[in-house]
């Protein structure tokens, strides 16, 4: 799947600034809402569902919304700031959760299964060299550094991590995915946020 879809872009700060994301199609958004208004129901009777479908259609640029092929990309990494004692558990939990994701046994995996979405767990920086079947290997480094003492990542590592995410999404698009959700696992989100 994604492993076979190699994209050889070399990312730089300047290159990232030049990336263009097509904005949602405002006319399509209005058209889809108008289509809902022609359905036999009270005006806005479907509530937020009408707005959600209009947003999806505007992003896809198509009023015939097809999200039959969907994925959840789950990025897994450890953060060095855990050394400050700010987490109730150690970094070994990240690896355990990633293994659970690879088996589709995590909460995200189970929710994805109920919607028919594929799951793509990614090791972007787990502090372990263990190879896990079903876990896409895109490791930038073995966990970040402790940002309480030094920068968590170098500029080059940051660019590599961003590039990895872009390449995974491009691979999904090339594989026919119509909608992608993202998730993550690490133990220190409240601290790094």
Predicted regions and their residues:
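Gly-rich Lys/Arg/Thr-decorated short loops/hinges at beta-loop-alpha junctions or inter-strand turns
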Residues: 35-37, 89-92, 139-153
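A structural motif shared across PLP-dependent enzymes of the aminotransferase-like
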Residues: 128-137
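Generic N-terminal amphipathic, Lys/Arg-enriched alpha-helix
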Residues: 7-23, 27-40
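An N-cap/entry alpha-helix motif that binds or orients negatively charged groups
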Residues: 27-64
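Active-site cofactor/substrate anionic-group-binding motifs, chiefly glycine-
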Residues: 66-69, 73-126
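Solvent-exposed alpha-helices and their adjacent loops that cap or buttress functional pockets
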Residues: 60-68, 112, 171-175
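Conserved small/polar residues in nucleotide/adenosyl-binding loops
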Residues: 185-191
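Glycine-rich, mobile lid/loop segments that gate access to catalytic sites or pores
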Residues: 143, 150-184
């Amino acid at each position: 799947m994604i492993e076979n879809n190699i994209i050889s872009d070399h990312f730089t700060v300047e290159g990232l600034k030049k990336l263009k994301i097509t904005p949602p199609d405002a006319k399509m958004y209005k058209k889809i809402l108008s289509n809902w208004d022609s359905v036999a129901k009270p005006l806005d009777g479907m509530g937020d569902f009408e707005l959600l479908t209009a947003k999806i259609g505007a992003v896809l640029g198509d009023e015939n919304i097809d999200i039959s092929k969907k994925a959840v990309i789950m990025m897994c990494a450890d953060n060095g700031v855990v050394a400050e004692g700010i987490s109730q558990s150690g970094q070994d939990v990240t690896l355990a959760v990633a293994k659970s994701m690879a088996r589709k046994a995590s909460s995200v995996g189970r929710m994805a299964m109920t919607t028919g979405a594929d799951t793509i767990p990614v090791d972007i920086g787990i502090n372990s060299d263990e190879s896990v079947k079903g876990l896409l290997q895109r490791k930038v480094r073995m966990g970040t550094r402790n940002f309480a003492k030094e920068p968590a990542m170098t500029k080059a590592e940051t660019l590599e991590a961003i590039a990895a995410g872009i390449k995974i999404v491009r691979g999904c698009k090339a594989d026919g995915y119509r909608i992608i959700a993202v998730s993550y696992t690490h133990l220190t989100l409240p601290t790094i946020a």
